[in-house]
Amino acid sequence: MAEVKKSIPKRRFVGKKNRKENNLDGSNRDVENAALVTINSKRSAGRVATQIPEDILNDKAINEAIKLLPQNYNFEIHKTIWHIRLRKAKRVALQLPEGLLMFGCILSDIFEQFCQVETIVMGDVTYGACCIDDFTARALDCDFLVHYGHSCLIPVDQTPIKVLYVFVDIKIDLQHVVSSLKHNLPSNSRLALVGTIQFVGSLNSIKDALQIQDEDGKGGFYVVIPQAKPLSPGEALGCTSPYIEKGSVDALIYIGDGRFHLESVMIANPDLPAYRYDPYSHKLSIESYAHEEMKSIRYSAVEKARTAKKFGLIQGTLGRQGSPKVLENLKNTLRKNNKDFVCVLMSEIFPSRLGQFSDIDAWIQVACPRLSIDWGYAFPAPLLTPYEASAAFNVVPWKEVYPMDFYATNSLGNWTPNNPENRPLPNRKKTGPVSS
């Protein structure tokens, strides 16, 4: 009997951590120190709700309450109060990721005081935009949901209750970002800027400042902000990132903390040198990823799954992670290949839980692709993504560049939710016959 400890990973597969090495120009400058310079740090006015009534914007009590929240975090309180009142909501659900959950009680108090509503703070884990829990909010008899910290991945016309997405833009030290990049990267380089949704609003200001050439010759960068629709320009998710045409830029610049979203962009663009600027620590670091090791591990799982006799199909139930249409497409693929399978609904997927299904030879999970990429080696049987399952049964060839297009509208095939084959038809108003 195998030891349990061996099946529990000490860390997830993250390639390699940041390292110090030569910069693009061959120098070995410390990428964590940069001199400050003065730039135009005007903030983008995008996403401002211009229709908010003046009596809400100028309400002294509301503005005093807002001061209880961090001033560099934009929780869009005025806009939220306006929407709650406009919709005549009675019970409002507040869904926040773990990093913002500490502000849940303050937000709840504000809306109960100024909107005369009952609020429910949803405390279940929220990993990303795919975890929006509109169905649970409806089951709790809520008529309005405010989802914080993520982009509008599930359109509001596809939710059973009214939903307001609040990105929670975070103000950062734009001067330090730009000076750090100008100090450490060769002038006139071609750069691609990406980040998480909290910092996407700052990317255009950073781009404008980087394109300016200073008197000392630094700067003058050619900067692009790539987009993977339906995401915002420059936005990266852990499973969906923009593909940047090979040779079009010299380096990738990621604005954000942590590596999870950055790794997605690096996987999609394996030939690009990558830098990460952490707005909290004010450090610029060179990042790397063990692409060949990751692809070798994943292809080995695909090869092993090809000989499996019985499959387990996991439909993720954490928020909106699962996709009934993707699941049905996978069922059809397994049927065509005469494979036996069983469907399992699961909110979170753990090795110990799947280990209880001793008769399953391989798994395919419609939840989070990164679960297989980062943790797949830790499971007792191959745990494939929908893309990997499609490659296993020759629906699509194995790609040299691992695709990170799970929510992209131009994805490779019907094993992704937003592929044209799987997208729901738009709601159209019925019209009567036209009289002549």
UniProtKB/Swiss-Prot annotation:
It catalyses: L-histidyl-[translation elongation factor 2] + S-adenosyl-L-methionine = 2-[(3S)-amino-3-carboxypropyl]-L-histidyl-[translation elongation factor 2] + S-methyl-5'-thioadenosine + H(+). It is an enzyme of class 2 (transferase). Pathway: Protein modification; peptidyl-diphthamide biosynthesis. Catalyzes the first step of diphthamide biosynthesis, a post-translational modification of histidine which occurs in elongation factor 2. Dph1 and dph2 transfer a 3-amino-3-carboxypropyl (ACP) group from S-adenosyl-L-methionine (SAM) to a histidine residue, the reaction is assisted by a reduction system comprising dph3 and a NADH-dependent reductase, predominantly cbr1. GO terms for molecular function: 2-(3-amino-3-carboxypropyl)histidine synthase activity; 4 iron, 4 sulfur cluster binding; metal ion binding. The gene is dph1. The keyword Transferase applies. Belongs to the DPH1/DPH2 family. DPH1 subfamily. GO terms for cellular component: 2-(3-amino-3-carboxypropyl)histidine synthase complex; cytosol; nucleus. This is 2-(3-amino-3-carboxypropyl)histidine synthase subunit 1. InterPro entries: DPH1/DPH2, DPH1/DPH2_1, DPH1/DPH2_2, DPH1/DPH2_3, DPH1/DPH2_euk_archaea. [4Fe-4S] cluster binds at residues 130, 239, 368. It is found in: Cytoplasm. Its main location: cytoplasm. Pfam families: Diphthamide_syn. Residues 7-19, 426-436 have a biased composition (Basic residues). Residues 1-27, 417-436 are annotated as: Disordered. Keywords: Cytoplasm, Iron, Iron-sulfur, Metal-binding, S-adenosyl-L-methionine, Transferase. Disruption phenotype: Sensitive to methyl methanesulfonate (MMS, causes DNA breaks) and hydroxyurea (HU, ribonucleotide reductase inhibitor).
